[in-house]
Amino acid sequence: MKQAFVDKTVTVAVRDTEVPVPKPGQVLIRVVVSGTNPKDWKMAHWRPDAPPVNQGDDIAGYVEAVGEGVVGFKKGDKVAAFHEMLAPYGSFGEYAIAWEHTTFHLTSKTSFEGGKYEPRELTLRSH
């Protein structure tokens, strides 16, 4: 699969990588829409010694696979999720990994574009 990585000079490189396998409690999502936030390019300045990373955290797409113990989702479900910051396999790729507890179903009337904003908005409203 292809992923976009941002390095410390805020240069984006697209690389071929393996499709990840979800671990227990994780959901593998085939990305349809990915959001971007200021932290996606600022992180390179905040952590200049960090390796290039796929920084995208706002995901909307279809469940491709689930890890052991995941019961609320199955392949083909239309979902949105918040990716764990700084973890591998963010939303700037063909597939992304999210935790089950940060993933939720989208209704048939909810667009992927609208759905991808919900994880961040819910986080902001809870603080």
For each feature predicted by the language model, list its residue ranges.
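Extracellular beta-rich ligand/substrate-recognition surface
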Residues: 4-12
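Extracytoplasmic/periplasmic beta-strand context in beta-sandwich domains
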Residues: 2, 15, 77, 93-94
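Glycine-rich beta-strand-centered segment in the early N-terminal region that forms part
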Residues: 18-35, 44-85
